Amino acid sequence: NDDVYASLDFDGYHIDQVGDRGNVYDYYGSKLNLVDGFASFIKKMKMRQLNKSLVMNAVANFGSQQIAGTRDVDFLYSELWSGESAFSDLLSIMKTNQSYNDSLAQVYAAYMDYNSSKSEFNTPGVLLTDAVMFAIGADHLELGDHMLCNEYFPNSNLKMSDALKTAIVHYYDFFTAYENILRDKGTQNYDAIYSGNSSVIINNWPPKLNTVTAYTKEVNGKEIIHLLNFVKANSLSWRDLDGSMPEPETINSLSLGVRASSVKKIWVASPDCYGGAPQELHFRQQGDYVAFTVPSLKYWTMIVIEK
């Protein structure tokens, strides 16, 4: 560790592991507690180089509590596999990990189209997964020299289409522009959201097929509603293993009713249109409820209600 930093000006160290291997033993036949070993290893590395950053991969969340509990890593980092393949897992894992250390953000290593034999990533699958991750406040480790499709990072069998290259920039611009709204701590809200369109069902988190799923959070006095389009989705797995997630149809002029009083302003923004720029909406206050119309929803539209 010291020799590496003496020769190379790295910012820090990425510590990896291979996940839960059941009972393991040392050379002398004594049983090992790997997760406790992770924590002591991190702490000793930090003590030797206090100014260097550390992160450790919790493969399938193995050891995540011990890793986070050291408070010596820069963020919560989980590599997800088949046991954590549901969209709903993305929020539950993040909440669990942040219960161990609520000062750190969650980053997922999550490989898209893992079993696909195609030559390109499936754009709808990638964008829907990123939409969900970003909406809940997590990040996706997916870009380097190329987009990752495999735990072996040099694997570049799948390429990004021109459409995906363009869209992914909009998504990361959006995530950066609105990071305080997306990442600041808040309280999840489960109040019903009423649709004025009989053909569109609004479903509160967790995601459900054939619906628009809403993830709602109170952040710094604002009510933030993320609309996620699962109307045409063919699976509730973020992995899109064979690259078959269909492109959603854009829903235009979606009338909604939300429980919210003393509303001062409502605006929407989406990485799918207008470069993520905010659009202020007209609204109608009716007692404890407010009615308004969302201009469009493709993958993800964020609604901000200011009170």
Where are these regions (language model features)?
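C-terminal beta-strand-rich structural cap/linker in extracellular carbohydrate-active enzymes
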Residues: 285-307
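Acidic-and-aromatic substrate-binding clefts and catalytic sites of carbohydrate-active enzymes
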Residues: 60-66, 80-90, 114-123, 149-151, ...
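Active-site neighborhood of glycoside hydrolase catalytic domains
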Residues: 1-75, 81-92
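Conserved, mostly hydrophobic/aromatic
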Residues: 16, 74, 133, 225, ...
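A cross-family glycoside hydrolase active-site/sugar-binding cleft signature
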Residues: 14-16, 55-59, 79, 107-111, ...
